[in-house]
């Protein structure tokens, strides 16, 4: 079958790779000059299935109000003048109940755990290298309230059989030796030894090369204007003056997926703006060995070979990609507070990207009401974590195979109107 994949971020490239492995003739189209040049370019570098969780959680609405008055708040909201933003935020608020959080987190962990299995198989099969490390993830708590609040996440981890370790301040140095100097600032940590790290852009670039070796064609610097529709099916992709035709089409355009298919269906994928800095390591002993999550500031600090990536925060501000100096200040403050002297933040590069986020946190992967149109978008901050599993899942669906995991609650159908004309809740 001929398949066109729109988008060459980590999700699009993974889709193309697994489709090619399944025997399909695949073409990837992207407006950029190469793979992983937008949201996948400088993310936090984490593959964290155990920390797969929706931003919509109990207590978040009250926290959001408090964060409005904090200098280093992890969340910021600025109205972008669209009705869609207001609708999306309302849907997110509806998912901030304990019941919905548990369901949403459960299915996110399901996909993320499967995706890690797919990544490990990929690595074993191909030997792909991307400055990867398998040292686990350590979530750091600065208050007793944060530590106590981790109980609900631990319950989900136990239910999903995800291994974890709850560490005291004195035990943190066993996972991250450099934290010994700052353990007095912390109340403990939750470590997931099965999590991994690496350079997502490097991974995507090398996966694209592997896909090319399987026959995938990449068309970069190509405009993606619209889908041509005939007889209730997709008849092609309009790329400037050319129409590219195939048997099936995959939309993996991240935050831009929403507007691109708006004439066909409505999907609640909104851009969640995030930031990162990447600093050279100047003192190996003072740098992290794997990756940590600062629960207070929602910031991840990740070790690459000779660099430290510091990323996080969320701004609900539309498609604004301006770099805000105050956000860089927060990132530098966090890494210098936990790993002082480990990296030279004065020489750090500064980046921002738009994560495609759904209000319930779960991505949209699978079939649509249009028989030959498939979606693979809405992964939020977990694009790399979920990319291989989403790509394999999509390849199975397009190939007519039964997926290895439950997939019906991952598709766009959970958002579409039921027979009574009511929009289904995101967790249905």
From Swiss-Prot:
Keywords: FAD, Flavoprotein, Oxidoreductase
Chain positions recorded as FAD binding sites: 3-17
InterPro entries, alphabetized: DadA (IPR023080), FAD-dep_OxRdtase (IPR006076), FAD/NAD-bd_sf (IPR036188)
Catalysis: reaction(s): a D-alpha-amino acid + A + H2O = a 2-oxocarboxylate + AH2 + NH4(+)
EC number: 1.4.99.-
GO biological process, any: D-alanine catabolic process
Cofactors: FAD
GO molecular function, one term: D-amino-acid dehydrogenase activity
Transmembrane segments: none
GO cellular component terms, A-Z: cytoplasm; plasma membrane
Pathway per the UniProt entry: Amino-acid degradation; D-alanine degradation; NH(3) and pyruvate from D-alanine: step 1/1
Keyword Calcium: no
Keyword Thylakoid among UniProt keywords: no
Family membership: Belongs to the DadA oxidoreductase family.
The protein's role, per its UniProt record: Oxidative deamination of D-amino acids.
Protein name: D-amino acid dehydrogenase
